[in-house]
């Protein structure tokens, strides 16, 4: 009997080492780190203490990285400083709507620069982030909004039609439509 493992033609990582350019401070078994250097990204991760909150991690990074890019998407970037400022504005806006700590806020967005701003703003306001798949049908969206009890929703304009079909069927009182 022949097994698949007897017929592999795979090259082991140790055999590939010679095919990558060598950089004195980049291990040859991790060639992707070269691109990290190009973009000024850390090549190692400093693990926070077990009791560190996500907000504490962001606060530390705001202070540490300021004007450096936090996110890059479709040719645009968002610095840590801008993320800090804009997410604080979102948090203040949510509070100005009368929403309270613990209220649920739905966010129906793909991976775009608006997402981290809104997500962090929701968390900073002490509210609960409800991620919503932007590809949901109106029936799926209605179910998630009802199930979560979301009182507000941030939605990219491309997906607003889906929400329009269910807007009168749930507890959502505040709708923020974002442009790309």
Predicted feature residues:
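AMP-dependent adenylate-forming
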Residues: 30-34, 39, 56-79
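Conserved AMP-binding/adenylate-forming core of the ANL superfamily
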Residues: 46-50, 67-112, 116-120, 137-142
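Structural core segment of the AMP-binding/adenylate-forming
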Residues: 2-23, 96-97, 124-180
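Asparagine-centered polar/low-complexity signal
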Residues: 61, 111, 131-133
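Flexible, non-catalytic linker and terminal segments flanking ANL/adenylate-forming cores
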Residues: 1-51
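Generic structural signal for beta-strand residues in well-ordered domains
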Residues: 62-64, 98-100, 168
């Amino acid at each position: 009997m022949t097994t698949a493992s007897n017929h592999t033609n795979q090259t082991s990582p140790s055999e590939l080492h010679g095919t990558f350019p060598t950089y004195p401070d980049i291990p040859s078994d991790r060639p992707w780190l070269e691109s990290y250097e190009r973009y000024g990204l850390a090549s190692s991760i400093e693990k926070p203490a077990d009791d560190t909150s996500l907000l504490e991690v962001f606060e530390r990074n705001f202070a540490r990285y300021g004007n450096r890019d936090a996110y890059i998407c479709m040719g645009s970037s968002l610095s840590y400083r801008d993320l800090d400022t804009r997410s604080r504005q979102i948090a203040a806006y949510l509070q100005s709507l009368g929403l309270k700590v613990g209220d649920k806020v739905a966010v129906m967005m793909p991976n775009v620069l608006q997402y981290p701003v809104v997500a962090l703003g929701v968390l900073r306001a002490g509210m609960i982030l409800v991620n919503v798949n932007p590809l949901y049908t109106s029936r799926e969206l209605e179910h998630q909004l009802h199930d979560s009890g979301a009182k507000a929703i941030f939605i990219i304009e491309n997906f607003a039609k889906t929400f329009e079909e269910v807007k009168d069927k749930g507890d959502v009182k505040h709708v923020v439509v974002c442009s790309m």
